[in-house]
Every structure is written in structure tokens, then in C-alpha cells.
Amino acid sequence: MHVDVVSIFPEYFAPLDLSLIGRARASGTLRLAVHDLRAWTHDVHRTVDDTPYGGGPGMVMRPEPWGEALDALAPPGGTPPRLLVPTPAGVPFSQALAHELASESHLLFACGRYEGIDQRVLDHAASRMPVTEVSLGDYVLFGGEVAVLVILEAVTRLLPGVLGNVGSLDDESHAHGLLEAPMYTKPAAWRDREVPAVLRSGDHGKIARWRRNEALVRTVARRPDMIAALAPESLDPRDRAVLEGAGFSAPPGDVAE
């Protein structure tokens, strides 16, 4: 995968040399380039922002440097990348979107600052490439850099060969619309707390059922919206019994066997 990131703080992305993302870069699985937006300014002050039309607080990022940056990194006539713009006004980022982005060959991130990027930049970009405005959640950050770090980590770990055990992707939170069950390791007893006996039983069927039950209970308690979004046919009678025991009425519909 080829990724370009444009920011006025390129040094913000130094952590992308570390851990599994760093390995993905070293192996060529992830080809990442970080660009300074100010490289596309032409005044002595390297200006990237100005006051907003219509008044109001803060500053808005000017269209000229952004236009030149996008022209340079996504030349007209070439295969367009997918442009991602982190913004509190964007669609919520999710594991499903991470999987969608992991299938792209070229991602281009535009890190806004201040009150955001002049809307004309995004409107013009949308005429020649797919544009997705994306939000990490219902809160506001100083800029898009933190969001890009989060999105890149979520996407990179889905690329082939990045994780040593691809089975990790099947059991983790959000993989099947549920939060992950609690995890335990050695020792079996610690500070008067023992690992659940079923996990030490060696009975893989019982272990899988225990984990499913725990995932359902945890998701009901912490993210009832996720339970409500599950397809009724994805729940078997045992699932429904667990949910009802946790105080949640499973939606009516076909029942999984």
C-alpha cells in the first residue's frame, strides 16, 4: 500500500518508524511518505491560513497550498488515490471502514488545522478522486495528525503479512460486531484471583462458548448500540439467553442454529 500524508507538522509522524508499522515500512508492505504542506507555499512567511469569510473565530487553511499539494501527489490523468480528511464533521471511523481502506492501493491524508481546510479544496478534489471526511469520535482535536496515526495503525495491521498471527483479526473487538472477551495469561493464580477454570480445561468447544458469552455480556454493558445493530439471524438460542440474562431483549427475527 502507498500512503501520502500532508501536514504542517511532518515531525508528528516519527512514531510510524516504530513497532509493526515500522516493520511494514521496512519490508515494503507500507510505502509511506510524509510531506510538509508549507513546501507548496510561495511567500516569505510560508502562509497556510487566513481569516474566515463571514467572520468568526479562528483561521481557515488557504486553498492554494492544498491545491498544489494535491496536484503534485495526485497528478491529473493518473490513477487517483483515495483522499482522507480527518474532521469532527466526518463520518465515524470504524473497523468496517478500516477494512475498506485496507483494500485501497493508495491513500492520501490531508491533515487540517485551525478551523479546517477551505471547502473548495475538498469540492475540487472530489471531482477527480474519492474523498472521505472521517472523524474519530464526538470530540475536537488540535488537528488531523492524531487521527491519521490512529487510522494508519488500524489499516496497516489489516495488510497481509503485518500480523504474525492472522487469527488475531478474527477474535478481536469489533471483528464480529462484538467487543472481545476478557483475556488471561500465566500465572493461573495472581493476588487471590484465578483464571476462569474453563480456560484451563482444554475443552475448545466450552472455551469458545465462554468467550462468546463474555463478549455478549461485555458488549451489552459497554456498547448496547452494537448489540442492537446485530443481525437477528446471527444470534443462536444460547446467545439470546445470555442477552436476556444480561437484561437485553434480543431483536425478533430468524434464529441462528
UniProtKB/Swiss-Prot annotation:
List the InterPro entries hit by this protein, alphabetically. Alpha/beta_knot_MTases, tRNA_m1G_MeTrfase_C_sf, tRNA_m1G_MeTrfase_TrmD, tRNA_m1G_MTases_N, tRNA_MeTrfase_TRMD/TRM10
> What is one GO cellular-component annotation here?
cytosol
Write out the residues that bind S-adenosyl-L-methionine: G112, L136, G137, D138, Y139, V140, L141
List where this protein forms a coiled coil: none
Compartments it resides in: Cytoplasm
Q: Which domain of life is it from?
A: Bacteria
Q: Which residues cross the membrane?
A: none
| Biological-process GO terms, alphabetical | tRNA N1-guanine methylation
Answer whether the UniProt record assigns the keyword tRNA processing to this protein.
yes
Catalysed reaction(s) here are: guanosine(37) in tRNA + S-adenosyl-L-methionine = N(1)-methylguanosine(37) in tRNA + S-adenosyl-L-homocysteine + H(+)
The main place the protein resides is cytoplasm
Among the GO molecular function terms of this UniProt record, one is: tRNA (guanine(37)-N1)-methyltransferase activity
Q: Which SUPFAM superfamilies match?
A: alpha/beta knot
The EC number(s) given in the record are 2.1.1.228
Task: State its role.
Answer: Specifically methylates guanosine-37 in various tRNAs.
Name the family the entry cites.
Answer: Belongs to the RNA methyltransferase TrmD family.
**Subunit notes for this chain?**
Homodimer.
Name the UniProt record assigns to this protein: tRNA (guanine-N(1)-)-methyltransferase
The source organism is Salinispora arenicola (strain CNS-205)
What does the record give as the organism's lineage?
Answer: Bacteria, Bacillati, Actinomycetota, Actinomycetes, Micromonosporales
